[in-house]
């Protein structure tokens, strides 16, 4: 359903955002 698709997309965006944040905090190359 559309809701499931939206939930999946939100999870992916959140995961990508967290990865970038960890990257900046640790000072490693992304």
Curated annotation (Swiss-Prot):
Pfam families per record: Antimicrobial_2
Subcellular location: Secreted
Cysteine disulfide links: 23-30
Keyword Secreted annotated: yes
Tissue: Expressed by the skin glands.
Main location: secreted
GO BP of this protein: defense response to Gram-negative bacterium; defense response to Gram-positive bacterium; innate immune response; killing of cells of another organism
GO cellular component, one term: extracellular region
Function summary: Antimicrobial peptide. Active against Gram-negative bacterium E.coli (MIC=12.5 uM) and against Gram-positive bacterium S.aureus (MIC=50 uM).
Family (UniProt): Belongs to the frog skin active peptide (FSAP) family. Ranatuerin subfamily.
Protein name: Ranatuerin-2OK
Species the sequence originates in: Nidirana okinavana
């Amino acid at each position: 359903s559309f809701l499931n698709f939206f939930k999946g997309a939100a999870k992916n965006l959140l995961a990508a955002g967290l990865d970038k944040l960890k990257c900046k905090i640790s000072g490693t190359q992304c």
